[in-house]
Amino acid sequence: MTVIVLSGPIGAGKSSLTGILSKYLGTNPFYESVDDNPVLPLFYENPKKYAFLLQVYFLNTRFRSIKSALTDDNNVLDRSIYEDALFFQMNADIGRATPEEVDTYYELLHNMMSELDRMPKKNPDLLVHIDVSYDTMLKRIQKRGRNYEQLSYDPTLEDYYKRLLRYYKPWYEKYDYSPKMTIDGDKLDFMASEEDRQEVLNQIVAKLKEMGKFEDDWKPNLVK
């Protein structure tokens, strides 16, 4: 039984890889609520006003998901609570949160992480980070077509997206809740190429075998 969490910037392909990987491993996918998120469009319309509310919304849903995943112990999550502070801190750094909101957010996050520490299974088994360049990120954002994410909707998103990518490297380096690995999302287009998809799956399975989570003769479910 394994719990795998994915990470990566907006448009990296986390939800797509979650579906591919969960089917391959025979586990259950957990998807972050985006299309039915009532706060996300408001945030893109007025980031300063809604940054705190959006992050509390995400924090709550990610906390619920990781609790369920750790209890079930057989899941792939397309994003997790461990990544949450990265987004809020970036928004705070560019003036989209008051000092009071920053204090409230981190107190809430601390309380939630403390509750996870009391669970029988405290951490995921593996973090899979999808590393992409700005060009790849933008191409995938354009392809999925959410209007409020497009540079044509708000040209200032260019700075936001580039800044977000800069925040990921130190976050990944500091992450220590579980073993971790990186997928090269520029080189391996696992959404469009069957060959690349299989290579990504092979890399993840090899890591799980190295960790002792899978036997050497483990066989996957068939991927259609």
From Swiss-Prot:
Binding sites annotated in the UniProt record for ATP: G8, P9, I10, G11, A12, G13, K14, S15, S16
Gene Ontology cellular-component annotations: cytoplasm
Superkingdom as given in the UniProt entry: Bacteria
Keywords: ATP-binding, Kinase, Nucleotide-binding, Transferase
Top EC class for this record: transferase
Enzymatic reactions: 2'-deoxyguanosine + ATP = dGMP + ADP + H(+)
Pfam families membership: dNK (PF01712)
EC number(s) reported in the record: 2.7.1.113
Residue positions of the active site: D78 (proton acceptor)
Keyword Metal-binding appears in the UniProt entry: no
InterPro entries assigned: DCK/DGK, Deoxyribonucleoside_kinase, DNK_dom, P-loop_NTPase
Residues noted as binding substrate in the record, renumbered to the chain: E32, Y44, Q55, R79, D84, E149
A GO term, aspect molecular function: deoxyguanosine kinase activity
Coiled-coil regions listed: none
Protein's UniProt keywords contain Transferase: yes
Complexes and interactors: Heterodimer of a deoxyadenosine (DAK) and a deoxyguanosine kinase (DGK).
PANTHER family: DEOXYADENOSINE KINASE (PTHR10513:SF35), DEOXYNUCLEOSIDE KINASE (PTHR10513)
Family, per entry: Belongs to the DCK/DGK family.
Function: DGK/DAK plays an essential role in generating the deoxyribonucleotide precursors, dGTP and dATP, for DNA metabolism.
Name of this protein: Deoxyguanosine kinase
Lineage of source species: Bacteria, Bacillati, Bacillota, Bacilli, Lactobacillales
